[in-house]
Every structure is written in structure tokens, then in C-alpha cells.
């Protein structure tokens, strides 16, 4: 299975936000087909604060709005985003699998509040939202993390994408899609990480 054209635009969107490539965002928005941006675009934008921080996410929202807008939100998008602890916990377990307990423990050792915020905000409130399939969310995370050369987290989310249903070929295609946005060294390193951590058991 290969990435569809819509998925290609999403991973490119995610990488461009992470890198602060505002002209790339303008091009993406202005060349979007009829029906896009849609909720999937908006979900990628919203989750980007987890990977790129609020400053770039806010700037990306402004750039996309000025370039043509983000479409009309569905009513359920605007419901109060109450966290779903159960949903977030299940998602965390699916992404990290047998390493989930060790990852939680490492976060706790770093700072207990960091572990709590990641569980309650990143997973329960943001990544467990409807509007974008979990495996597509992970592919967009792969794009953002590869763009920023965050190897350890790239490895985790590349594996997570496969565990959630993406194919290994799709994870590799993410890198091909964003290749021109990365430096040659960053691209080569990302390819090595993805090849190693998504190989067949």
C-alpha cells in the first residue's frame, strides 16, 4: 500500500510546520484541491504543537489562514476537548507496545509532571481525538520528527505507525515525500533510523 495524494499533502504539511517553512505552507494551501483543507488538515495543524511547539503552530495557522483558510470546522471539532484518559492510555500502549512501561518510567525519572502532561495532554487530549486515523497521525509525527532530526522519537513513532496499521513502505514514503525539505544528512539519517526500527522482526 502506498500513500494517497491526500496523505502526501498531510505529511508535507506536518514537516513544513515543524521546520517553519512558511512559503511551503503557502504553496500547499494554494494548490490544495477542492475539498481541502479539511478536518484532516486541521488535525495535523492542531497536533503540531506537540512536535513543533506553540510558536510555530500559531504562525502556521496564521500563514494558512492568510493563504486561503483552513475550511469550515465540523461542529464536533469544536466540542470542548475533554481528555480521554482511557483512549490516551490505550493509544500509548499500542504505540510503545512492550516498551510502554519503560517509556513511562523514563519520563517519570526526568520529571513527574512531564510524564503526566504527556499522558493527559499529548495522548488523552490531542492524539486520541477523532478526525484523523491513528496511523495517519503517526505518519505525520514521523514527518515532523524526521524534519527536526529527533532520532529517538522518530524511531518510536516510526514503529508506532506500523503498530497502528501503516505499512513499512508508507513510513519510507513519508521520507521520500519530504526529502526536498530536509538536508541530505538529515534525510540519510532518517532513512537509516526508519530502516532499522521498522524492519521485520
Regions found by a protein language model. Name each.
Residues 1-9, 15-43, 49-134, 163, ...:
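Acidic, glycine/proline-rich low-complexity segments that act as flexible tails and inter-domain linkers
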